[in-house]
Amino acid sequence: MKTKIKATVALLGATMIASSFVNAATPSTIITIVKLSGIAWFDRMEQGVKRYAKDTGAAASQVGAAKGDVQLQIQLIEDTIAKKPTAIAVVPLSPEAVEPVLKKAAAAGVVVVTHEASSIQNASYDIEAFKNADYGVHLMDSLAKCMGEEGQYATFVGSLTSKTHNEWVDAAVARQKEKYPKMEMVGSKNESTDNEAVAHDKALEVLRTYPKLKGFQGSSSLDVPGIGRAIEERSLQGKICVFGTGLPSNTKQYLDSGAINQISFWDPADAGYAMNKVAQMVIDGKKIATGDDLGIPGYNKVTLDGKVIYGQAWVDVTKENAAKYPF
């Protein structure tokens, strides 16, 4: 009898050990869910996700809705939860709107990490390339220098519910009021819906409404190319300053023509890689602390504020150095 018991215990132990080896060998499934698919910004982010998969062996992939619609993104997150991934990395159109579905993901045992959502509650961590207020101040200082610190300017956001875009603009306007009193923001924030054609049309409308306008600040990666096209059509290169977030791949022609003065950005590929790496760290039970090096450019000495991880990852690009960034 004792022999049988010992044999049974040994068999159970062997089974548990074998099971642990299988679990350890099973790669994590991490699905990155972006605001929308098919635009340069998130195409570049997908390169980072694929690089993470190649480097680590994780089953890492990226999905996005065909257009920037909050309800479509929520449904996509719902569909993704049903696939039972190990983790999801979400770049939300509206952090507030996705809170309930992210809560559902966490309740289902799915690790949640976000980007561009510093107010998020239902995630283990949110990853930001930099402190949004610092970036907004930087954009305003650049715009003000170009405008000679005086005159009217207009601001654009991809969405009025995009926390990141609004934080940039709010910080920029606060900086203007504090340091550049001869400058004036005209109208309210213009919403491009992350659509270059909409940004173009609204820029033309702003130019008609405010003929003395001297500057634009864009937030979505599709704002400045849309604005730049409007500037070219009106032959206003060199007369109106255009600054904002963008990528060389869809702004270089306007940088070269002078329709856009400068773009600033962080590499979305590195952000995508960072989200996936942090998700795996959470899966492994690891904690992030201020001063940690994630081993990713711009995230070599992060700052942790609550659950928000901040890097120092922005770069400025003009026509002089655009060729250095082939994406």
Model regions: which residues?
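A residue-level marker of the well-folded mature domains of exported/periplasmic proteins
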Residues: 22-327
